[in-house]
Amino acid sequence: EMTLDEYEQSGTGTGAVLKLGGIPVLGSPWFTFPLSAERKSGFLSPVLGMSSARGLDISVPYYFNIAPNYDYTLTPQIITKRGVMIGNEFRFLNKHLEGEITGEYMPHDNDYGDKRYSLHANIRGSWNNFGYGINYNRVSDDEFFDDFSTSLRDNTDDILPQDYWLNYSSTYWNAAVRVTKNQTINLSLIHIS
């Protein structure tokens, strides 16, 4: 059953069942959805996977529409052979600053025997004649990308940049300061099991 509320620009559904080939695979006793293009807080599509190394892998992201220029996505992930991982993505945009901060954290990896994490922050801005920014990338260990596929991996050739910069521009002169450090992923240390 579905109810549409045009005044609130939202719909409500009850007793929904997703069937594949006539077989029920997912059910929801209650859910809401927007009727317009406006963003709305709520669950996003879950992601299911399975592999011999990770076992059953289930992610259920929840999107928080904090404000028109701020949002946050929390993604709990259960990996049956490894443990529980929490993914985070925070995005923001205002007059002098914009960026995104993403991270994943696993308090204890059953296979690795320790905590695991990744962090990416890309923040940039300008104010008057100044420009500034941070591009920070870090993982807990050399094997993180092989064990947990992540978008941070797409941006690197086994070197994770950690850049901070500030520049000033005027009609007659320019100045810039940049501090750079890298985390090198040592592929020769990675074991294959």
Predicted regions and their residues:
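Outer-membrane beta-barrel proteins and related beta-barrel translocases across Gram-negative bacteria
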Residues: 1-193
